C-alpha cells in the first residue's frame, strides 16, 4: 500500500500529539533541584508542576482539554457562567492557543495531584486516569469539595482524596501545602443549567475553590487559581512569607470581568508582599488574549514611586522557573541550544562558508 493511502487522520494525530511528546516529562524527571531552591514548570493555563529540593513532585490544575472546535452550534450553553455574568447568547469563541507540553500518560513520579476549583480548564479526567493507571497507588488527590466530588465521580477511590478548605494544611513529603481563601466570583455562579442565580444567596466559596501556598525548604509559591483581585490578598501577605506569586491575567472581553488586569497583578504582588509576580492563564484562551508586557510597562512606571518590593516575570508555557536563581530575571526564553558549537570540526567546503 502506498504511504499516502496508509495514512489516516488517527495516525496523523498519534504521530503529532501531544506536540512535545515526553520531552518535558523527561526534563522534569531528570531535574536535580539544588538545596535552597525549588523548580517549577508552566503546563499551560494555570497548570504548574512543582519540584522541591527533596525531589517531591506535585502538580496543580494540570488540564489536558481543549476549547471550541466547531462553529456547529452558534449559541452558548444554557446557564453557562459567562451567560449569567453578561447576559449573552452567542457562542464564546474561546479556542485553545497553547500546545500540550506534558504527556499525562508518561507521568511516573508524582506525589500529589491538586486542583484549585472544578472549572473544566483546571481539573482533568485524563490526568486522574493516567495517575491512577501508571503511578504509585497512594498518590493523593487534593482539592476543595467540588473537585473531590468530581474525582470520586470519575472513579478515583474516596480514600485517595483529601478535601481541603481555607486554613487546612497538608504535608506531602518536604512540601507543606496551605489551603487559603479563594476569590473566584465566577465559581459562585457556576451552577446547573436549570438553577437560577438571580436573587439567590450564593453558597460558600470554601467548598468550591481554594488558593494554595506551597512552602518548600527552598522557598514558597502562592497559586491563586482563577481568583480575581481581592483586598484579602494583603491578609495572606501579612500571615505568610511569599516568594513567588502566580495570578490569572487576561484581557477581559466587553461586559466580562473574569481575569485580573495588569493593574490588578501589581496590586496583588504588593498586597502579598511577594518577591516575584508571574502572570498565567493569559496563554490559553484566544478571546482573553493579553500581552503580559503590559504588566512590566506599568511596573516600570510605578516601581520607584510606590517602592515596589517585587518584580514581574514573563514566562512561556513549558518553561522552567527556579527560585531564587531566576528572581532577578524579567523574561523567560526557551533554551537556544548550540552551546557546544565547534567542539568538532565543521564539515564545510571552505571556512568562508561560515
Swiss-Prot record:
Presence of the UniProt keyword Membrane in the record? no
Instruction: List the protein's name.
Output: Probable L-ascorbate-6-phosphate lactonase UlaG
| NCBIfam families per the UniProt record, alphabetical | PRK11709.1
Q: Which Gene3D superfamilies match?
A: Ribonuclease Z/Hydroxyacylglutathione hydrolase-like
Q: Give the EC number(s) listed in the UniProt record.
A: 3.1.1.-
Per its UniProt record, the required cofactor names are: a divalent metal cation
Q: Which HAMAP family match?
A: UlaG (MF_01266)
Q: In which pathway does it act?
A: Cofactor degradation; L-ascorbate degradation; D-xylulose 5-phosphate from L-ascorbate: step 1/4
Broad enzyme group = hydrolase
Give a short account of what the protein does: Probably catalyzes the hydrolysis of L-ascorbate-6-P into 3-keto-L-gulonate-6-P. Is essential for L-ascorbate utilization under anaerobic conditions. Also shows phosphodiesterase activity, hydrolyzing phosphodiester bond in the artificial chromogenic substrate bis-p-nitrophenyl phosphate (bis-pNPP).
**Which family does the entry's similarity section mention?**
Belongs to the UlaG family.
The record's induction entry says:
Induced by L-ascorbate. Repressed by UlaR.
Q: Which reaction does it catalyse?
A: L-ascorbate 6-phosphate + H2O = 3-dehydro-L-gulonate 6-phosphate
CDD domains, per the entry: UlaG-like_MBL-fold (cd16284)
Could you state a single Gene Ontology molecular function term? hydrolase activity
Q: What is the species of this protein?
A: Escherichia coli (strain K12)
Q: Which UniProt keywords apply?
A: Cytoplasm, Hydrolase
Hydrolase is among the record's keywords: yes
InterPro entries per the record? L-ascorbate_6P_UlaG, Metallo-B-lactamas, RibonucZ/Hydroxyglut_hydro, UlaG-like_MBL-fold, UPF0173_UPF0282_UlaG_hydrolase
List GO BP terms, alphabetically: L-ascorbic acid catabolic process
One Gene Ontology CC term in the entry: cytoplasm
Q: Where does this protein chiefly localize?
A: cytoplasm
Amino acid at each position: 500500500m502506498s504511504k499516502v493511502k496508509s495514512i489516516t487522520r488517527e495516525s496523523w494525530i498519534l504521530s503529532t500529539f501531544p506536540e512535545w511528546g515526553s520531552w518535558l516529562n523527561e526534563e522534569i524527571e531528570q531535574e536535580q533541584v539544588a538545596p535552597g531552591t525549588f523548580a517549577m514548570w508552566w503546563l499551560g493555563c494555570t497548570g504548574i508542576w512543582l519540584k522541591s529540593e527533596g525531589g517531591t513532585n506535585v502538580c496543580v490544575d494540570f488540564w489536558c482539554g481543549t476549547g471550541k472546535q466547531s462553529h456547529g452550534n452558534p449559541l452558548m450553553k444554557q446557564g453557562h457562567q459567562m451567560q449569567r455574568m453578561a447576559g449573552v447568547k452567542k457562542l464564546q469563541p474561546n479556542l485553545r492557543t497553547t500546545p500540550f507540553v506534558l504527556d499525562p500518560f508518561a507521568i511516573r513520579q508524582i506525589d500529589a495531584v491538586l486542583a484549585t476549583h472544578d472549572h473544566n480548564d483546571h481539573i482533568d479526567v485524563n490526568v486522574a486516569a493516567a495517575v491512577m493507571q501508571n503511578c504509585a497507588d497512594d498518590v493523593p488527590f487534593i482539592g476543595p469539595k467540588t473537585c473531590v466530588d468530581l474525582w470520586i465521580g470519575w472513579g478515583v477511590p474516596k480514600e485517595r482524596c483529601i478535601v481541603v478548605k481555607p486554613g487546612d494544611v497538608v504535608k506531602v513529603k518536604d512540601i507543606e501545602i496551605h489551603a487559603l481563601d479563594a476569590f473566584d466570583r465566577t465559581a459562585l455562579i457556576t451552577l446547573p443549567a436549570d438553577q437560577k442565580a438571580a436573587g439567590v444567596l450564593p453558597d460558600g466559596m470554601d467548598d468550591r475553590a481554594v488558593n494554595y501556598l506551597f512552602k518548600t525548604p527552598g522557598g514558597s509559591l502562592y497559586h491563586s487559581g482563577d481568583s480575581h483581585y481581592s483586598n484579602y490578598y494583603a491578609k495572606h501577605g501579612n500571615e505568610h512569607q511569599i516568594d513567588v506569586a502566580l495570578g490569572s491575567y487576561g484581557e477581559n472581553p466587553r461586559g466580562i470581568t473574569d481575569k485580573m488586569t495588569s493593574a490588578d497583578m501589581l496590586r496583588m504582588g504588593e498586597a502579598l508582599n511577594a518577591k516575584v509576580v508571574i502572570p498565567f492563564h493569559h496563554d490559553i484562551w484566544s478571546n482573553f488574549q493579553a500581552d503580559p508586557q503590559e504588566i512590566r510597562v506599568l511596573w516600570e512606571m510605578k516601581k520607584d514611586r510606590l517602592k515596589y518590593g517585587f518584580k514581574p516575570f514573563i514566562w512561556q508555557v513549558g518553561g522552567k522557573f527556579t527560585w531564587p536563581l531566576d528572581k532577578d530575571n524579567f523574561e523567560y526564553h526557551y533554551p537556544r541550544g548550540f552551546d557546544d558549537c565547534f567542539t568538532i570540526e565543521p564539515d564545510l567546503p571552505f571556512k568562508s562558508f561560515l
